[in-house]
Amino acid sequence: MVHFEQWEGFEGRIWREEVNVRDFIQKNYKPYAGDERFLAGPTEATDKLWGILQKLQKEERAKGGVLDMETHVVSGLTAYGAGYISEADKALEQIVGLQTDKPLKRAFMPFGGIKMAEEACRNYGYEPDPELHRIFTEYAPTHNEGVFMAYTPEMKKARHNKIITGLPDTYGRGRIVGDYRRVALYGIDFLIEEKTKDLANCGDGTMTEDVIRLREEIAKQIKALKGMKAMAAAYGFDISKPAANAKEACQWLYFGYLAAIKTQNGAAMSVGRISTFLDIYMERDLARGLITEAQAQELIDHMVMKFRMVKFARIPSYNALFSGDPVWATLEVGGIGVDGRSMVTKNDYRFLHTLENMGPSPEPNMTVLYSEDLPDAFKHYAAKISVLTSSVQYENDDVMKPVWGDDYSICCCVSATQTGKEMQFFGARANLAKCLLYALNGGVDVKTREQVGPAYRPVAGEVLDYDEVIAAYDRMMDWLAGLYVNTLNLIQYMHDKYYYEAAEMALIDTDVRRTFATGIAGFSHVVDSLSAIKYAKVTPIRDETGLIVDFKTEGDFPRYGNDDDRADDIAVWLLGKFLEKIKKRHTYRDSEPTTSILTITSNVVYGKATGSMPDGRKAGEPLSPGANPSYGAEKNGLLASLNSTAKLPYHWALDGISNTQTINPGALGHNDEERAKNLVQVMDGYFMQGAHHLNVNVFGTEKLIDAMEHPEKEEYANFTIRVSGYAVKFIDLTREQQLDVIARTCHDRM
């Protein structure tokens, strides 16, 4: 059994014999059932550093969204020396480490695609070093180049026509959460020893392709671990051994995360589930009199400050899909252990308290793992923070725990992954609304007039027949699912080949479980359109070529979002049918297929590429985001809308079901305390039905309109809203996306 002096005072055996952070947590954490009265406000150092950073953020916004960009140095673990928020005030920083050499400066990351890295620079007025272009076009192939060399004509056509879109073929796929806690608990040298053992035992003497690839990957992981040590040494820290105290635990853990964001520009670079783990160190130091509560809070404030600073260089087409500069540094608090004990600690409060000490912020993507069994005081405090900041999302721990255990992280917006045991292949989304139009028009795209899907017989007749439409849709969805999975298989293969996440995978078990994520866009529009065809009279309007370009819908029909089983049953059918078709296909590296109903802000882009629908949505209008009902469809209030979404089975959408709701403050109560109490009651009822996710916004439409018209007002500098799966500063959205948010339902009654 291994023993380090840094482990003095910790209980347990298994975690000492193998890399097992969960066992360490279960044997050592102390649940906290009290309220927030113990919390400390910001220290002088926190206020000063946050003030400096806010000034830099204002300069960044004034320069069009980018403060500075690298043009000569390729990002890597040791590409830069030490960097600080302020060189003059670096002694104030309790947690150190920047992606580059300056705060908010964006790194040059060409391995996902040299063209994209160069375009990101030029879009903001920076000219990349031509030598980098030569190197990455003549000598070092990139992920993007590999993908487009292998794409079939059919894949390219489907991508161009945006029936599958948002694909991670021009940027890092992300959604891989390294178990950054391992750096703090074990130190790098022990982790290297364990990976070296894995390398020695990889293969049984027959060098198959899988064995050869795995041996190469483990070797890359060991190299990355050594690079982490060198990176930390530049800041004067030796992370070869375990962390000895709370400050080192926070710093060591952050160095693990910093290694990930220095080497990958994934769409989601989640932090993971760290609050309870770090609380163990906090409690030990507090008991020994080594720190005060103010110092404990300062450590968390400074760590969160670093998460708020994460930036990547992006191209305009990426920003259109994922608006507002998100990085999904998702961080979880709360949850209940499989033994029934609450996993809420004082540290869970401290992380939420950063939204008070430093104000609202989209990052880290703060996520409460919700259960009706959470301590009442914690539920009330989280709800209060939601009412005050609209910066928190909630996910149902009671439906996720049976699948992922009690040590999972949220690896993107809403997707769970078992920490240190699993990885996810990110797969963007298929536009099922567009697929329905393909079914009606025999595979012809109404926007481009190209034959994209199979040339099946178009749906005929003066009035659409439900059974005929369903049969045609089933065939077209089958084609789309096959093409979608094949395209993703190709992308994931090339990402492993040219842009492997060595730093993150070094902090995950070698024998890793892989999930294969897919996604659905246009969900509610398909449901309502099929409902209209079934329960009303839908007459297709054809142009001179016979192509259906619009619809005349007569009569009432049930809409998803009103707790009406006639519509909601169609929604359940659609989700199950799509997953069934995905699961029939071969998936890369024996990964387990999952799907999601999640669109981010890409619903605007998807909508532009989608024609008119039978539900009344016109061509080019935004699609409704995630699993939300169509705009204007909700007629029976907030609770009815939530009840509809709750009927969607989580086990059919393990990649997540995103639901975003905006509630007028007056609808929740007369004051913040009453609003928090009522919000808890709403969430208890919603999640007890088996619902998966809820974004909560508490403000009125008039505030959004004022922020759009007067972004210069100080009160809107950090005005944060929840959108499909993440949070964003409202003034960082494009006007088109702001108008889309304003158009969404704001509930004035429960």
Task: Go through each PLM region and give its residues.
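Conserved catalytic cores of very large enzyme subunits
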Residues: 2-750
